[in-house]
């Protein structure tokens, strides 16, 4: 005649988060809550936040890896918005995905138009004169 409230057995195990079950670092529960509160749909399935969280984590890791490479190329140990800008704009797929996104303090890609560069003829002539 147990009431269902008390613990009879000692088979008590620690709860495992959905992020840990999916092998993710980003919080699945928080994404689920934001999907519910955002009024994107009347109902949200149990797999949708896990999938969305994994996509967000992958994109973040990809951008941070490229930005870290850009920071190392500039002999810096800290990623700044300029490194994010260089990473995104130099990657074709990320540039297409984030084409209309403005990154504050990101600057622009270095680009000199071909007509403004010195011609190859003048470079060869200058070296022969010496």
Curated annotation (Swiss-Prot):
Pfam families found in the cross-reference section: Histone, Histone_H2A_C
N5-methylglutamine carried by residues: 105
Region (Disordered): 1-21
SUPFAM superfamilies (UniProt xref): Histone-fold (SSF47113)
UniProt-listed InterPro entries: Histone-fold, Histone_H2A, Histone_H2A/H2B/H3, Histone_H2A_C, Histone_H2A_CS
Record GO terms (molecular function): DNA binding; protein heterodimerization activity; structural constituent of chromatin
Gene Ontology BP, a term: DNA repair
Residue positions where Phosphoserine is found in the record: 127
N-acetylserine: modified positions: 2
Disulfide bridge map: none
A GO CC annotation given for this chain: nucleosome
UniProt keyword annotations, A-Z: Acetylation, Chromosome, DNA damage, DNA repair, DNA-binding, Methylation, Nucleosome core, Nucleus, Phosphoprotein
Chain positions found as N6-acetyllysine: 5, 7
Post-translational modifications: Phosphorylated to form H2AS128ph (gamma-H2A) in response to DNA double-strand breaks (DSBs) generated by exogenous genotoxic agents and by stalled replication forks. Phosphorylation is dependent on the DNA damage checkpoint kinases MEC1/ATR and TEL1/ATM, spreads on either side of a detected DSB site and may mark the surrounding chromatin for recruitment of proteins required for DNA damage signaling and repair. Gamma-H2A is removed from the DNA prior to the strand invasion-primer extension step of the repair process and subsequently dephosphorylated.
Compartment(s): Nucleus; Chromosome
Motif, [ST]-Q motif: chain positions: 127-128
SMART domains: H2A (SM00414)
Task performed by this protein: Core component of nucleosome which plays a central role in DNA double strand break (DSB) repair. Nucleosomes wrap and compact DNA into chromatin, limiting DNA accessibility to the cellular machineries which require DNA as a template. Histones thereby play a central role in transcription regulation, DNA repair, DNA replication and chromosomal stability. DNA accessibility is regulated via a complex set of post-translational modifications of histones, also called histone code, and nucleosome remodeling.
Domain remark text: The [ST]-Q motif constitutes a recognition sequence for kinases from the PI3/PI4-kinase family.
Note in the entry: In contrast to vertebrates and insects, its C-terminus is not monoubiquitinated.
Protein family according to the UniProt entry: Belongs to the histone H2A family.
Subunit structure, as described in the record: The nucleosome is a histone octamer containing two molecules each of H2A, H2B, H3 and H4 assembled in one H3-H4 heterotetramer and two H2A-H2B heterodimers. The octamer wraps approximately 147 bp of DNA.
Protein name: Histone H2A.1
Species annotation: Meyerozyma guilliermondii (strain ATCC 6260 / CBS 566 / DSM 6381 / JCM 1539 / NBRC 10279 / NRRL Y-324)
């Amino acid at each position: 005649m147990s009431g269902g409230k008390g613990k009879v057995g000692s088979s008590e195990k620690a709860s495992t988060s959905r992020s840990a079950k999916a092998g993710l670092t980003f919080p699945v529960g928080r994404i689920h809550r934001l999907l519910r509160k955002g009024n994107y749909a009347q109902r949200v399935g149990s797999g949708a936040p896990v999938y969305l969280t994994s996509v967000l984590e992958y994109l973040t890791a990809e951008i941070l890896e490229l930005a870290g490479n850009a920071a190392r190329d500039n002999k810096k140990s800290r990623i700044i918005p300029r490194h994010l800008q260089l990473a995104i704009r130099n990657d074709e797929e990320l540039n297409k995905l984030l084409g209309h996104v403005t990154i504050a303090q990101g600057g622009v890609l270095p680009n000199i138009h071909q007509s403004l560069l010195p011609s190859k003829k003048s470079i060869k002539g200058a070296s022969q004169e010496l």
